[in-house]
Swiss-Prot record:
Originating species: Helicobacter hepaticus (strain ATCC 51449 / 3B1)
Keywords associated with the record: Cytoplasm, Elongation factor, Protein biosynthesis
An annotated Gene Ontology molecular function: translation elongation factor activity
Intrachain disulfide bonds: none
CC per GO annotation: cytoplasm
Annotated GO biological process: peptide biosynthetic process
Protein name: Elongation factor P
Protein biosynthesis as UniProt keyword: yes
Gene3D superfamilies from the UniProt entry: 2.30.30.30, Nucleic acid-binding proteins
Pathway: Protein biosynthesis; polypeptide chain elongation
């Protein structure tokens, strides 16, 4: 199905020359002279590159053949992440490169969204908030308060986040996966 210029918006998935993209920024421009156009930044699902594209009044884009599946992370074996489809129990292996930066938030049993383009896995999305255990951080000192500064903490996945001084090794915390920021202790 063709997508017209007036339908473009942030987050929309489009296909140009057989490559699926997501619109990350969108600006409708109406110059004093001439026809209006849309300037957009689009990110490729295949290689992650961001390009700027201008769409003019009669331009059309195709809707990509994308399918999203909920899959559960099983284990990591030397360069490949193993996932299982939660409905069909079919298993797939994705390389470290295919999983990308979100690997630092993935723990055993975590359900993720995997996006497929023409039956090929192209991206992995983790939940916005994950609960992880702190494996290493500096000990508390007298006078450390919850409103004080921050200290680095290594999580069970190897990711390092800044946490308040009162947070201890072995505690479970919630982390925002988009920003990598500490949110709160798990109660």
């Amino acid at each position: 199905m063709a997508i017209g210029m007036s339908e473009l918006k942030k987050g929309l998935k489009i296909e140009i020359d057989g490559i699926p993209y997501r619109i990350t920024e969108y600006q409708h421009v109406k110059p004093g002279k001439g026809a209006a156009f849309v300037r957009a930044k689009i990110k490729s699902f295949l290689d992650g590159k961001v390009i700027e594209k201008t769409f003019h009044a009669g331009d059309k884009c195709e809707e990509p053949n994308l399918q999203e599946k909920t899959m559960q992370f099983l284990y990591h074996d030397g360069g490949a992440f193993q996932f299982m489809d939660t409905t069909t129990y079919e298993q797939i292996a994705l390389s470290d490169d295919q999983v990308g930066d979100v690997a630092k938030w993935i723990i055993d049993g975590l359900n993720v969204q995997i996006l497929f383009h023409n039956e090929k896995a192209i991206s992995v999305d983790v939940p916005l908030v994950v609960e992880l255990t702190i494996t290493e951080t500096a000990p508390n000192f007298k006078g450390d308060t919850s409103s004080g500064g921050k200290k680095p903490a290594t999580l069970e996945t190897g990711a390092v986040v800044q946490v308040p001084f009162h947070v201890l090794e072995g505690e479970k915390i919630k982390v925002n996966t988009e920003t990598g920021e500490y949110l709160e202790k798990v109660k």
